[in-house]
């Protein structure tokens, strides 16, 4: 019975691994896009504010401060 389950377990493992790799690649692309575009961050603040909050916290934890404040300042001046 163990020999029969081995190919199935291998297929499941490969599927889970592929899903993880797609997820990591997607998260990296999203981070890169948010990091390079203030306009995209503004779009994210309107549609997905919780994702933008994770972005701000991650860059603040890495030692980059002031991005949130610069964004808020620009968005406030663009409204006026």
UniProtKB/Swiss-Prot annotation:
Keyword annotations of the record: Membrane, Mitochondrion, Transmembrane, Transmembrane helix
Transmembrane segment boundaries:
15-31
* Any one Gene Ontology cellular component term annotated for this protein: mitochondrial membrane
Q: Does the keyword DNA damage apply?
A: no
The annotated topology with respect to the bilayer is:
Single-pass membrane protein
Report the locations given in the UniProt record.
Mitochondrion membrane
What the entry lists under InterPro entries is as follows: CEBPZOS (IPR037764)
Which domain of life, per UniProt? Eukaryota
Name this polypeptide is given: Protein CEBPZOS
* Annotated source species: Mus musculus
Q: Upper lineage ranks?
A: Eukaryota, Metazoa, Chordata, Craniata, Vertebrata
**Per UniProt, what is the name of the gene that codes for the protein in this document?**
Cebpzos
